[in-house]
Amino acid sequence: MIEIIEVQAREILDSRGNPTVEVDVTLSGGATGRAAVPSGASTGTREALELRDTRKKRYLGKGVEKAVENVNTLIGPVLYGMPADEQFMVDSTMIGLDGTANKSKLGANAILGVSMAVARAAADAYELPLYRYLGGIHAKHLPMPMMNIVNGGAHAANSLDIQEFMIIPVGGKTIAECVRMGAEVFHTLKKLLKAKGFATAVGDEGGFAPDLESNEAAIGFIMEAIKKAGYRPGRDVGIALDAAASEFYEKGKYVLKGEGKKLSSKQMVDYYENLIDKYPILSIEDGLAEQDWDNWVMMTDRLGNTTQIVGDDVFVTNPAIFEKGIREGLANSILIKLNQIGTVSETLQAIDMAKQAGYTTVISHRSGETEDAFIADLAVGVNGGQIKTGSLSRSDRIAKYNQLIRIEEALGAGAVLSNDFTAVVR
């Protein structure tokens, strides 16, 4: 009663008003699953390919009609009759049907939509919540949230070069308490920015996008907001950065246009080291560019003993690339994005590799999101440790936090909040 009998895709809009793919899967016993695919703004060059129509007169070239057609006419018929609880078989079949290294024939957005919807349909068939279906009896750890409250870089039209300034409510004992702490700091920050005459409009991921004079000024505002909200920086609430350094890497130099600086790889690491010495920065993501592979080892050696060094663009959730990074000592954490690799199975493989190698994992959204909260269930199902899903505003971000609160309630006394961080006081 779990055979796939119908696969139906459609074009919907994401949180930026751009088209994306949504897929419904129906099984022989009547179970159903629905999934919507996210989309990134700052993307790694080796990510699985998101198929767009490129017809400029329709959605300015960003339509996904071809990806939808591929699901409805090519992928669906091949999967009919296949058991939905054989996720690896389903995903391998789609990968084989595509036949390219980066899923460019059918589109990673087409393949991922089906992969996620199949997992949901199988969970429905077994009458299990998605997190329980994915993780079995071991699914009980809620992820520590990284909350992006100041946006810069490709996520905002301001002078900040660093893309995300996040808070981590390390002093929280439950996910509900973490969400409350984050919301209180977020709203306190809004008042502080407004009092200083800065705009409080939000960026793609729900964080504020003030036009500040430097990256350090943004950290200063966050420090003040933490204190004014009644929390201790480092002990109660830490700070994390996503530099997205590939976005400002030009001809072998890191060009911080907002600060008028042009830095070598070593100087860029010096820059981070100075910030870490002054502030409770617990995690730095994509501190160097994906093209600057060799210097990632240097950065990890210098900063990795005290700071989580997260690889996003440098690994793109790709098990083959990640395996090389593990072997060479790059980073000590990996960002996990479903649409970077394009199937649930390959995502689970990357997470398993990280755990075996002693890397932490951060389950992540994209800047273009929908109301789909799949990653919340995924984070709990795989005991992911951390989740990065935006600020404490915009319903596309809040949907994930709310789902985590529901899961925590369902787990009851068995729920455990993960905390990969040691309290840091600076």
From Swiss-Prot:
Primary site of residence: cytoplasm
This protein's name: Enolase
Recorded family membership: Belongs to the enolase family.
HAMAP family: Enolase
Pathway: Carbohydrate degradation; glycolysis; pyruvate from D-glyceraldehyde 3-phosphate: step 4/5
Entry function: Catalyzes the reversible conversion of 2-phosphoglycerate (2-PG) into phosphoenolpyruvate (PEP). It is essential for the degradation of carbohydrates via glycolysis.
Residues that bind (2R)-2-phosphoglycerate: Q163, K337, R366, S367, K388
